[in-house]
Amino acid sequence: MSKKTFEELFTELQHKAANGDPSTSRTAELVGKGVHAIGKKVVEEAAEVWMAAEYEGKDAAAEEISQLLYHVQVMMVARGISLDDVYAHL
């Protein structure tokens, strides 16, 4: 499995959202569906993080967290929110 930084993933998702084919790119598909659909995935993944952290092992929790981070970044791309916009609030 390839390892990416948070920043590398964000750059990749921006590219896929702008240039990807929704029939072959999950990112392009989600961005095309809009904020409501992405938001539903964020909520779903957040619940899965909680369940994995409480009832499963470290690896399962880490996998669910990675999926949550992906969907949060897709939301950022869809809304035109940059990493710097978020970092300004940390």
UniProtKB/Swiss-Prot annotation:
Domain of life according to the entry: Bacteria
Pfam families, A to Z: PRA-PH
Signal sequence, start to end: none
Keyword ATP-binding attached: yes
GO cellular component, one term: cytoplasm
Pathway involvement of the protein, from the record: Amino-acid biosynthesis; L-histidine biosynthesis; L-histidine from 5-phospho-alpha-D-ribose 1-diphosphate: step 2/9
GO molecular function: ATP binding; phosphoribosyl-ATP diphosphatase activity
Compartment annotation: Cytoplasm
Key words, A-Z: Amino-acid biosynthesis, ATP-binding, Cytoplasm, Histidine biosynthesis, Hydrolase, Nucleotide-binding
Entry's EC annotation: 3.6.1.31
GO BP annotations listed: L-histidine biosynthetic process
Reaction(s) catalysed by this chain's protein: 1-(5-phospho-beta-D-ribosyl)-ATP + H2O = 1-(5-phospho-beta-D-ribosyl)-5'-AMP + diphosphate + H(+)
Family per similarity comment: Belongs to the PRA-PH family.
NCBIfam families given in the database record: histidine_hisI, PRK00400.1-1
HAMAP family associated with the record: HisE (MF_01020)
Name of the protein described by the UniProt record: Phosphoribosyl-ATP pyrophosphatase
